[in-house]
A protein has these predicted regions:
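Helical segment within the ABC ATPase nucleotide-binding domain
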Residues: 191-204
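ABC ATPase "signature
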Residues: 236-237
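Conserved catalytic motifs of ABC-family nucleotide-binding domains
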Residues: 172
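Catalytic Walker B motif of ABC-type/P-loop ATPase nucleotide-binding domains
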Residues: 176-179
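Conserved ABC ATPase "signature" region
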Residues: 98, 117, 121, 129-147
Length: 279
């Protein structure tokens, strides 16, 4: 069986306090400059809660996910996952977390089944445990049987995203970090992913942080919705509370009132910088 870190009964699922992260950007005119990705962000998630973070590309959503999953170190502040510090207790945190992102990481020459078997071994699962479980989970996420032995590099983004979701379901994470999980998916696959998120909550009691710019998705799935803009968390309330606060009829109107910008104005600058740092 997968070896989980002990979960303290009274610990918050996520507790981030004044979390800061900056990246260094090279500019031909101004030379090097520091660009804030997160600026004193504080956020808590209760166990079993689903919280959606809305933000444009470059708002800091991916940075927040990477910090909580120990892929990045914060420049300031602190973050704990079920009581474990993401810096000091990284190994314990990783045993409790699974991250599904738009740029899901796989061994590209290996097949979906091979990637899932590798993930299972990484999490301490035995061959006997995964022999029947992996085909069942691939079927659950709608992955066609005749594509399961193809190299990942031959698969579309949507297909790869389904494998990422299968990996998350296989390892039954206590905290599921979803970074744009439905980006690039067709409408049917998108609905399947949303049903998967509901299943993770109902069957596995997972806590979920959903980073997205799909307003309907956030409102349908999340208990609370946060608005993140240029590294600043402007609000974190229920969808109805956000609409009431900004005197808006829709979540989109509330987002525009909070940020002064719509999603059509989004830029990809900081996300590109993050990818450069992580490369």
């Amino acid at each position: 069986m997968r070896e989980l870190s002990p979960v303290p009964p009274d610990a918050l699922a996520v507790e981030a306090i004044d979390l800061r992260k900056e990246f260094v950007r090279k500019d031909k005119k101004r030379g090097k400059r520091r660009v804030p990705a997160l600026a004193d962000v504080s956020i808590t998630l209760e166990r079993g809660e689903c919280v959606a973070i809305l933000g444009q590309n470059g708002s800091g959503k991916s940075t927040l996910v990477r910090l909580l999953s120990t892929l990045l170190l914060p420049d300031g502040g602190s973050a704990r996952v079920f009581g474990y510090d993401v810096v000091k207790d990284g190994k314990a945190v990783r045993r409790l977390v699974n991250r599904v992102s738009v740029e899901a990481s796989f061994f590209k020459k290996m097949s979906p089944s091979e990637n899932l078997h590798y993930a299972a071994r990484f999490y301490g699962m035995t061959v006997s445990e995964t022999k029947d479980e992996i085909p069942r989970i691939l079927e659950r996420v709608g992955f066609p049987p005749d594509r399961r032995t193809e190299p990942m590099e031959n698969l579309s983004r949507g297909m790869q995203q389904k494998v990422a979701l299968a990996r998350a379901l296989l390892t039954s994470p206590v905290l599921l970090l979803l970074d744009e999980p439905t980006t690039g998916l067709d409408p049917r696959s998108k609905l399947e992913v949303q049903e998967f998120i509901r299943e993770m909550r109902s069957l596995h009691d997972s806590t979920i942080l959903l980073c997205t710019h799909d307003l309907d998705e956030a409102e349908a799935l999340a208990d609370r919705v946060g608005i993140l803009d240029r590294g600043h968390l402007l609000a974190l309330e229920t969808a109805d509370e956000l609409k009431a606060r900004y005197e808006a009829d829709t979540l989109e109107q509330a987002f525009f009132a909070a940020t002064g910008r719509g999603f059509e104005d989004e830029e990809d600058e900081l996300d590109a910088e993050e990818r450069k740092v992580l490369a």
